[in-house]
Swiss-Prot record:
Its main location: virion. This is Structural protein ORF800. Residues 759-800 are annotated as: Disordered. It is found in: Virion. Residues 98-130, 447-475, 514-567, 606-633 form a coiled coil. Residues 761-776 have a biased composition (Acidic residues). It comes from the Viruses. It comes from Acidianus two-tailed virus. Keywords: Coiled coil, Virion. Residues 785-800 have a biased composition (Basic and acidic residues). The keyword Ion transport does not apply. The keyword Secreted does not apply.
C-alpha cells in the first residue's frame, strides 16, 4: 500500500482523511504503531480505514513476532491475531502465511516444553524418561544434535541399577567395583555423542578406583591381626570417605567406614585383651594367682559378649585358685616329735583345702587338672609322713636318733613346701592354650561382624517389602497379584540368601563355642519365617491372579449383557445361554481355585476367614447366576416358540385351526411362565402372553360357534332346489331360520371381535413395554423384598 496515494476529485474533508491515512501508514512503516493506530481510530470508520488499521496491526504483530525477547505465549497470541485479521482481510495478509506462523510457533512451544521435560528428567538422572522426550524432540527437529542425544541416552538408559547389598562385604564391594567400571565405560561411550556425559563417566571411573582401593583396605582389616596394620587400613578408608563425599558412592563408603571402625575397634580390644592374657599366664607361671586372675578378668571385660567361652572358663577357674592358701612355714624351733606332728597336720589341712579348690577349678577349666593332681599327690605323701610321725610319737627313739630323724624330715620339708616347683610345666601349657584362644577370638569376631552385616541386609529388604505392602492402596486384583509376586521374588532373591549365609557362619561359630546355640536357632527361625512368607505370598499371588481372571470374565459377561439391545426372543435366549456357559466354564473354575488356596492359607492362620467367606459367597453368587441364566434361556426359548406359533395365525384357513395354534402357543407361554417363576422374575414376562393366547383361543372359539350356527341353515337353503323346490311357506321358514342363525352368529362374531381386540391391546401394550425395556439395562440386584426385576428382553447383569 503506497504511502503517497491520493484519489482524484475528492472533497476537502475527504482529502484530509486521506492525508491522515497516509500519515498513519507512514508512521506504521517507521515503527510507531501506537500513534498510527491512534490516528486511524479518530477517523470515521469505513472499509478503507479498517483495512489500513488491519495493515498497521499486521506490521505491529510481525515486528513483535520477530523480537525473540517477546515471551512465546505472547507471540502465539499475536500470531492468532494475525490469523483473525488475515481471515477478514486476506488482501492485507495471507491466511496461509498466518496459519504457517501459528504452526511454527506451536512447534516451537512443543520443542520448548519437551526441552524443559528433558532437562528435568536429566537433572533427576531418569534416563529412560529423558530418552522418551529426546526421541519426541528428534521427531520434530531431526538434526545432528538430537540424533546424537538419542544415541547417547540409549546407551546410558541401558546401564542397570547398582547391585543391592547382599552376600559378604567383600563380595558386595567387588560387585560395586565391576558395576562402576562397566557404567564408566558406558557413559564414556555415550560422551562421544553427547559431551555432557563425560563428567559422569569420569565420576564413575573415579568411584570405581576408590571402591577398589576401599576393597583392598577392607581385606587388609579382615585378614590382619596386627593393630597397626588395621589402623593404617582404617586411616586409608577415612581418606577415601573424605575424597568421595562429592561422589555417588559417598553413602556406601560411609557405611563401610562405620563397619571398618567397629572391626578395628574389636581388633584393638582383642590385642589389649591378648596382652592381659599373656600377663595373666606369666603371673600364673610365677604362682601369683591373684595377679593372674586380675589380668584375666580385665581381658574378659574387654572382650565382653564376644569373649570365647574358654577365656571365661579360665577367668572363673582363676577366681577359685585365688582362694588357695600358702602352706604353713616350718617351725623355727622344734622341741619334740609333737611339734613336727602338729606342723605336718597343719600342712595336710592346707593341702586338703587347696586340693578341693583346684579340683573345682579344673572342673571348670580342665587345663588346671595337673595342679589338682599335684596337690593330691603331695597330700598323699604328707598323710604318709603324718602316719609315720604318729607311730614314732607313740614309741619315740633315743634322743640322738630323734634329732637325726627330725633333721632329715626338715630337709625334706625345705624341698617340698613350694607347690609351684612341680607345676611350672603345666602353667606354660595353659599359657599357650590361652594365646591360641585369643587369636581365634579375633577371627571369630570378623565372622560375627560379617554375619551381623548379612542379617542387617536381610532385615533392610524385609523392611522394604513391608513398606511396599503397607503403601499399596486402591489396587486392582491383577495389581494385587503382581504385588505379592514381586514381594515373594524380592524376599527369595534379596532377603533369604544373606540370612542363610549368616546362618552358616553362626552355626560354625556355635560349633567353636564362640556363641551360644540360641543365636543360631533365632536365625534359623527367621529363615523359616521368610520361607513361609514367600510360600504364602506366592499362594496369594496365584489366588489373586485367579480372582482377576474370574473378574475379567464377569466384566466381559456384564459388557455383553449391557450391549444386548433390540434382540429377538431367540437371540435373548441364546444370550442367556452363552452368558451361563461363559460363567460356568471361564469364571467359576478360577474362582474355585482361588477359594482352595485362600482356604488353605486360612487354615494355616496366614489370612483371616473373612476373605475366604467373601470368595465363597462370590462362588455361590456365580452359581446362582448360572442357574438363573439357564432358566431364563429356557424361558425365552419357550416364549420364542410361543410367538412363532402365533405368527402362523395369519395363514389359518378355519377358526378350528386358529384354536389349535393359539392353544399350542399358550402351552409354550405357560412353560415359559414356570421357568420365569423358578428364576424369581417379577413381573412375569409370560403372563401377558398367556392372556393374549387365551383371548385368541376364545376369539377363534366364538368364530367357530358362529360358523357352526350358520352352516346348517345355509345347507337347508342350498338344498331347496328343483326337482324338489320348496313351497313358499317352507322357503319363508328357511329364511327365517337363517336370519335367526345370522343373529346368533353375529353375537358370536361380536364376542370374537371383543376377544381379538383384547388380544391386540395386550400385544400393543407388550410391544411398547418391550421397546421401552430394550432401551434400558436391568442389573441383577435384589430389591428390598429379595425379588429381582426383569424386563421382557432386559439383560440381567451380575456383580462379584
Amino acid at each position: 500500500m503506497s504511502s503517497n496515494y491520493v484519489p482524484p476529485d475528492v472533497s476537502r474533508s475527504k482529502a484530509k482523511e486521506i492525508a491522515l491515512v497516509n500519515k498513519a501508514i507512514q508512521l506504521a512503516n517507521q515503527g510507531d504503531y501506537d500513534e498510527a493506530l491512534n490516528i486511524i481510530d479518530q477517523l470515521p470508520p469505513s472499509d478503507n480505514t479498517r483495512q489500513v488499521k488491519a495493515y498497521i496491526l499486521v506490521k505491529k504483530y510481525l515486528d513483535l513476532l520477530k523480537d525473540t525477547n517477546t515471551p512465546l505465549k505472547d507471540r502465539i497470541n499475536y500470531a492468532n491475531q494475525l490469523v483473525a485479521i488475515s481471515q477478514r482481510y486476506p488482501n492485507v495478509f495471507s491466511p496461509q502465511d498466518a496459519e504457517n506462523i501459528v504452526e511454527y510457533l506451536k512447534e516451537e512451544e512443543k520443542v520448548k516444553e519437551l526441552l524443559n521435560k528433558l532437562n528435568d528428567a536429566l537433572s533427576q538422572a531418569d534416563y529412560n524418561l529423558a530418552l522418551q522426550y529426546a526421541k519426541q524432540l528428534n521427531d520434530i527437529l531431526n538434526n545432528t544434535q538430537t540424533n546424537n542425544l538419542v544415541k547417547a541416552l540409549q546407551i546410558v538408559a541401558s546401564v542397570p541399577p547398582p547391585p543391592t547389598p547382599e552376600g559378604t562385604i567383600t563380595s558386595f564391594l567387588s560387585q560395586l567395583v565391576d558395576y562402576y567400571k562397566n557404567a564408566s565405560q558406558a557413559y564414556s561411550e555415550a560422551s562421544k555423542y553427547e559431551p555432557m556425559f563425560r563428567p559422569v563417566a569420569d565420576t564413575l571411573s573415579t568411584s570405581a578406583e576408590m571402591l577398589e582401593e576401599l576393597l583392598t583396605n577392607v581385606n587388609q582389616i579382615l585378614t590382619t591381626h596386627s593393630v597397626s596394620n588395621a589402623e593404617d587400613a582404617l586411616k586409608n578408608i577415612e581418606n577415601i570417605v573424605n575424597e568421595s563425599k562429592s561422589l555417588p558412592i559417598a553413602p556406601i563408603t560411609e557405611d563401610i567406614l562405620n563397619i571398618a571402625e567397629e572391626m578395628v575397634k574389636q581388633i584393638q580390644i582383642d590385642n589389649e585383651a591378648n596382652q592381659y592374657l599373656h600377663s595373666s599366664v606369666k603371673a600364673l607361671d610365677e604362682g601369683d594367682y591373684t595377679k593372674a586372675y586380675e589380668d584375666a578378668e580385665k581381658a574378659t571385660e574387654l572382650l565382653g559378649p564376644n569373649a570365647p567361652q574358654s577365656v571365661k572358663n579360665y577367668t572363673n577357674a582363676l577366681a577359685i585358685l585365688t582362694k588357695t592358701e600358702p602352706l604353713p612355714s616350718p617351725p623355727s624351733q622344734i622341741k619334740g616329735m609333737q611339734d613336727l606332728l602338729s606342723y605336718f597336720s597343719n600342712v595336710g589341712n592346707a593341702l586338703s583345702k587347696n586340693y578341693e579348690l583346684t579340683s573345682k577349678a579344673s572342673s571348670i577349666y580342665p587345663a588346671f587338672k595337673p595342679i589338682a593332681e599335684a596337690y593330691a599327690l603331695h597330700l598323699k605323701d604328707n598323710n604318709h609322713l603324718v602316719d609315720a610321725l604318729s607311730k614314732i610319737n607313740k614309741k619315740p627313739p633315743k634322743n640322738s636318733d630323734q634329732f637325726a630323724f627330725m633333721s632329715a624330715v626338715l630337709k625334706q620339708i625345705s624341698q617340698e613346701t613350694a607347690p609351684q616347683n612341680f607345676v611350672t610345666q603345666t602353667y606354660q601349657q595353659i599359657g599357650s592354650q590361652l594365646s591360641t584362644a585369643t587369636s581365634e577370638s579375633a577371627n571369630q569376631y570378623s565372622l560375627l561382624a560379617e554375619a551381623n552385616n548379612l542379617i542387617d541386609q536381610a532385615n533392610a529388604v524385609i523392611t522394604q517389602v513391608n513398606n511396599m505392602m503397607n503403601n499399596a492402596n486402591n489396587l486392582s486384583l491383577g495389581e494385587v497379584s503382581q504385588l505379592y509376586k514381586n514381594a515373594a521374588d524380592t524376599l527369595e532373591k534379596q532377603a533369604l540368601p544373606p540370612m542363610q549365609e549368616a546362618y552358616k557362619i553362626l552355626q560354625e561359630l556355635a560349633k567353636q563355642g564362640a556363641i551360644n546355640q540360641d543365636s543360631v536357632n533365632q536365625v534359623e527361625e527367621n529363615i523359616q519365617n521368610i520361607q513361609n512368607t514367600i510360600t504364602e505370598f506366592d499362594m496369594l499371588s496365584t489366588a489373586y491372579e485367579y480372582l482377576d481372571q474370574a473378574n475379567a470374565v464377569i466384566t466381559q459377561v456384564n459388557n455383553m449383557m449391557n450391549n444386548a439391545n433390540n434382540l429377538s426372543l431367540g437371540e435373548v435366549s441364546q444370550l442367556y445361554k452363552n452368558a451361563a456357559d461363559t460363567l460356568e466354564k471361564q469364571a467359576l473354575p478360577p474362582m474355585q481355585e482361588a477359594y482352595k488356596i485362600l482356604q488353605e492359607l486360612a487354615k494355616q492362620g496366614a489370612i483371616n476367614q473373612d476373605s475366604v467367606n467373601q470368595v465363597e459367597e462370590n462362588i455361590q453368587n456365580i452359581q446362582n447366576t448360572i442357574t438363573e441364566f439357564n432358566l431364563l434361556a429356557v424361558a425365552y426359548g419357550y416364549m420364542n416358540e410361543g410367538y412363532n406359533q402365533l405368527q402362523k395365525l395369519s395363514n389359518v384357513s378355519s377358526p378350528s385351526q386358529g384354536v389349535i395354534i393359539a392353544r399350542s402357543a399358550k402351552h409354550y407361554f405357560e412353560q415359559a411362565s414356570r421357568e420365569f417363576e423358578r428364576a424369581n422374575v417379577n413381573p412375569n414376562p409370560a403372563k401377558p402372553a398367556i392372556e393374549q393366547a387365551t383371548d385368541l383361543i376364545l376369539g377363534f372359539d366364538e368364530l367357530e360357534k358362529a360358523q357352526n350356527t350358520i352352516a346348517p341353515e345355509r345347507k337347508h337353503i342350498a338344498g331347496a332346489r328343483p326337482p324338489n323346490p320348496p313351497t313358499n311357506a317352507e322357503l319363508a321358514k328357511y329364511y327365517e331360520q337363517l336370519s335367526n342363525a345370522y343373529n346368533t352368529a353375529a353375537e358370536y362374531a361380536y364376542n370374537a371381535e371383543k376377544y381379538f381386540a383384547e388380544a391386540e391391546s395386550i400385544a400393543e401394550s407388550e410391544s411398547e413395554t418391550t421397546e421401552s425395556e430394550n432401551n434400558e439395562t436391568t442389573e441383577s440386584t435384589a430389591n428390598s423384598e429379595g425379588e429381582k426385576q426383569e424386563g421382557e428382553h432386559g439383560a440381567r447383569l451380575i456383580r462379584v
